Amino acid sequence: MSAHMSGLEIMDEDQLIKDVLDKFLNCHEQTYDEEFLNTFTHLSQEDHVSKRGVFGTDSSENIFTSAKVTHKNEADDYHLRNKTIFLRTSSQCLEEQVDNFLDLEDLDMDEEIKPQMSEDLLLLPGEVEQDVSTSIPSCIPFVAQPPTCEVKPKPSVKRMDKQTEEILGDEVQLFSLDEEFDYDNVMLTSKFSPAEIENIKELCKQQKRKDTSPDLEKSCD
């Protein structure tokens, strides 16, 4: 009996293998056409756009497009409900994110485009600022000078004032000599007045006396 049963099992296995091979060989050749692509569940073009958060579309259209893709069974219905909830929440999040952006009309584009440059960078080589600051420095260095009563105005100062009065333009002006000024006969003026020179001499003599007095005391000792 055991040998007969084993023989039947072998025949059944052979028959099953033969049937499987026949089905495989007799089935029609499957190509990459619409029939083959329809076997896969994929998102349509409309569903892809709605998932990106295109505003102005109705939520019922998103539900309808997602319902066409899923199968009509309970498990797929549950998947569909989760999918529609995700689409709604994602679109709401995108709407809130867009609302946080500022309108271009509210921004002053001229202020952001124009670089904040200091006035010093706009000066050409050799130019001087026209607005001279008149503020007093916080720290003035002390220089031992004799008391002065009068200060004579110098002609060079007048010439500098005339040059500063000229309007500086963007074009570089060529250097030219003043035809009215006699460069050969220039009157040299002293930096100090005669009274100031006398005071300086007196101070020098006093300083020499102070320096020589300790030496004399040492020699006497």
UniProtKB/Swiss-Prot annotation:
Annotated keywords: Phosphoprotein
UniProt keyword Membrane, yes or no: no
Modified residues (Phosphoserine): 59
Key word Phosphoprotein present: yes
Biological process, per Gene Ontology: acrosome reaction; spermatogenesis
GO CC terms in record: 9+0 non-motile cilium; cytosol
Matching InterPro entries: IFTAP
Any one GO molecular-function label of the UniProt entry: intraciliary transport particle A binding
PANTHER family per UniProt: INTRAFLAGELLAR TRANSPORT-ASSOCIATED PROTEIN (PTHR35543:SF1), PROTEIN C11ORF74 (PTHR35543)
Assembly notes: Interacts with IFT122; the interaction associates IFTAP with IFT-A complex.
Physiological role: Seems to play a role in ciliary BBSome localization, maybe through interaction with IFT-A complex.
UniProt-recorded name of the protein: Intraflagellar transport-associated protein
Protein source organism: Homo sapiens
